[in-house]
């Protein structure tokens, strides 16, 4: 994705402007904050037992992000371009949150054939534990539930079908698409959609800037150093969140500014 960094990556402020102005691209992907004042739902997991937890996270911040995006899409009413009636909003997760699931993960098409062996003798021939997914569309009946097995490859399959793209792997090539989520011939107007009220998100705790980075945060900072530091070999990963935030702003802050 590096070749598209200066063309296809934008800030959340610009995203909301595009929603309001009806200028969203055909496909937009929102990545939550995963470093400092997180809103990605991901807990700041300890590095090992009895090791202090670095960072800070509050699931209410993730709920607020989902609320703000949904509310912006619901309010978009431009005559041309993107608007609430022609935008499909999909909210999904890459992990199940370590919650128990009584349904055993089913088998799945391997990405390749033959499929090379992965870690722990795994051949990628089975799906993982179920994750929640919310689909919002003016052409989806309120309260609809899809009970058949669908995995993340369905998103890629849907995009490939809609835009006549080649599949990435056998997994997404044989995946079901999301077409059965579109159940209405006439749209439900946004005035009939729910109006959720988000819970108040408290500010980050005092001293957050002095907390250590967890493994995910170290990876994010390390990638930024490797790509954008003029001397990557001489630039160390900072030990605290505050120092990491300052470094990231120095390395990549201006790269989101578009002419």
Predicted stretch roles:
Residues 1-259:
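N-terminal pro-sequences and low-complexity stem/linker regions of secreted or lumenal proteins
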